[in-house]
């Protein structure tokens, strides 16, 4: 550690464990080729290598310990091998230039899509890169939660100031505090809210409640259905029969009657007609 003169190194294949802090604060290290037999990257082993821009995690690596690469501020891309299983806390904390994480397709524990690191079934995000350039993100339909990030820093899952809009699908059942719409200010060591942040989602879901709780813009994705038009009014032996056109996408209809106190709901139905039996001779009624 603290080898400021070190710029390039190849770790011999005889090395199976990279000890904690092994190359920490090697601030001029630009290239490192890890052992093909490496199984573990120890705590802080490659932390604060501030000149390192890319790294390949070999297929042999199973464990990346806490803060393994924290503070690698120029790191732009990470390639993760096929056998990584255990990932410690804040492994990439403070890697503020990181744009993409690519996971080997044969990895049974993790996957990646568009540079974002997920668990294998894409039910949760492992890491959304700090410096990914996209201004908008839509959660996969498989995603179940937006929980506080432990691989990144300080509990913020989508810690990216470029990100202004997140669209949340219906399957997301949980959003932790500060998970989205916030960024960590490393200079002043505090959490800031993203200006003009927008959450898109469905009414009555965690997306709407999270947006309202944090005073973010909320855009509802629920379909706006057409109001049915009354197609026929007729007198029948049972009363006045009201018929209307079927509206595509509607699962039911509500019939209202105008009263002296305003509109009164008189019927919920899945049919496209309703017969009002509460009528009398010379009576006028208004429906909608």
Where are these regions (language model features)?
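Hydrophobic core positions of the immunoglobulin-like beta-sandwich fold
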Residues: 244, 274-277
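Extracellular low-complexity, O-glycosylation-prone stalks/linkers
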Residues: 249-265
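Structural signature of tandem-repeat unit edges
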Residues: 3-17, 26-40, 49-63, 72-86, ...
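Beta-strand-rich modules
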Residues: 276-288
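Short beta-strand segments within Ig-like beta-sandwich modules, predominantly Fibronectin type-III
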Residues: 265-271
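Low-complexity, Pro/Thr/Ser/Gly/Ala-rich linker/spacer regions in secreted
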Residues: 147, 154-157, 218-229, 236
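Pro/Thr/Ser/Gly-rich low-complexity, intrinsically disordered linker/stalk tracts
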Residues: 223-249, 281
């Amino acid at each position: 550690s603290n080898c400021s003169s070190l710029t390039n190194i190849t770790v011999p294949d005889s090395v199976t464990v990279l000890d904690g802090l092994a190359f920490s604060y090697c601030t001029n290290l630009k290239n490192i080729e890890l052992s093909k037999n490496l199984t573990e990257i120890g705590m802080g082993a490659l932390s604060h290598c501030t000149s390192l821009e890319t790294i390949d995690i070999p297929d042999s690596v199973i464990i990346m310990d806490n803060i393994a690469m924290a503070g690698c501020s120029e790191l732009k891309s990470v390639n993760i091998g096929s056998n990584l299983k255990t990932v410690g806390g804040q492994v990439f904390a403070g890697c503020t230039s990181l744009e993409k994480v690519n996971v080997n397709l044969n990895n049974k524990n993790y996957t990646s899509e568009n540079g974002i690191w997920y668990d294998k079934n894409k039910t949760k995000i492992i890491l959304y890169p700090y410096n990914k350039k996209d201004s908008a993100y839509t959660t996969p339909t498989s995603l179940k939660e937006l929980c506080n990030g432990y691989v990144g820093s300080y509990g913020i899952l989508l810690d990216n100031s470029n990100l202004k809009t997140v669209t949340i699908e219906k399957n997301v059942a949980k959003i932790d505090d500060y998970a989205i719409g916030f960024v960590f200010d490393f200079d002043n060591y505090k959490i800031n809210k993203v200006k003009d942040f927008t959450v898109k989602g469905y009414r009555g879901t965690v997306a709407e409640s999270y947006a309202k709780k944090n005073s973010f813009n909320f855009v509802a994705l629920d379909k706006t259905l057409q109001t049915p038009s009354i197609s026929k009014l007729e007198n029948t032996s049972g009363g006045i029969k009201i018929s209307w056109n079927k509206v595509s996408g509607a699962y039911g209809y509500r019939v209202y009657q105008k009263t002296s106190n305003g509109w009164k709901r008189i019927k919920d139905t899945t049919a496209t007609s309703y017969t009002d039996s509460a009528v009398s001779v010379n009576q006028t009624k208004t429906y909608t």
